């Protein structure tokens, strides 16, 4: 086996790890994450989400939410969790609930991207 083969990255495994890490920081359970990406929480335990799948696309959007929020609050994890659980007049609800639908997830992400643009 060559060195290149030994270091080949499995994108599906990396995506699950990134999703689980983002969810942990945002105060989300595996059940919550499963609701966002449309999979049972047991699917997350198996450790693979194909990036090109519908679930993979939703996982990538949630990771973008995490990254945008991280920038806005300077990485303060307590503030990130607070923001997710606080009613937001601009997004029209609780972000932690809104992200469980595709429309809500995109609304929250668009809001965060717009706020980041003001920095």
Locate predicted features.
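Non-transmembrane "mature" sequence context
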Residues: 1-119
